[in-house]
């Protein structure tokens, strides 16, 4: 045999031995499952009972809505209030690098104009506002909030007013099945002047197709489990 044949034969033997080894990433006591990729869809209209509909009563120049469903068996908390807290904390603690890069570029461009700046993506930038009159769960600054009496639907509204526009964003969680929660993130913008309209025309495509979906994937990835656990293993936070 030539040295090439001997090398190939040895490689095949080692490959066979490696494939026979038990997976080391599985933990005893758990059934291995594959987490399905997040499927985010864009809606043309806000849900009929959206709290965001009560915001910006004047003309709305730009809006978008994104929605996805989560499997509660892959979440640390199966209470809607606990999940909302986890998502909002993830928005603050782990903003996606690509979105942060875009925000740094934006800040450099608009700071000389006296506009608001933030290292967080615009939809959630008001989570850093220390002067907010309301706080969700006593922790997170919000403009408005609503929780159904039966605990099946929780909504919060974020946002701010600037020289060129006013924006409002909402995060909503609705229980839609035994093991499913619907997450909806929506934004409405009312422009105050011509510059606001030009500004939104420039950023709307990136906001709709990249910023919001990327923020949602990053936040949901933070609150999901690498291994599914029973709800008893991660007790829900008290409402």
Walk through the language-model features, giving the residues of each.
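A short acidic/glycine-rich loop-to-helix N-cap element
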Residues: 189-210
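Glycine-rich, low-complexity intrinsically disordered segments
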Residues: 213-214
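Hydrophobic-ligand binding "helix-grip"
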Residues: 131-178
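Hydrophobic ligand-binding cavity/cleft-lining segments
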Residues: 25-129
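Short, highly charged C-terminal tails/helix-capping segments
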Residues: 220-239
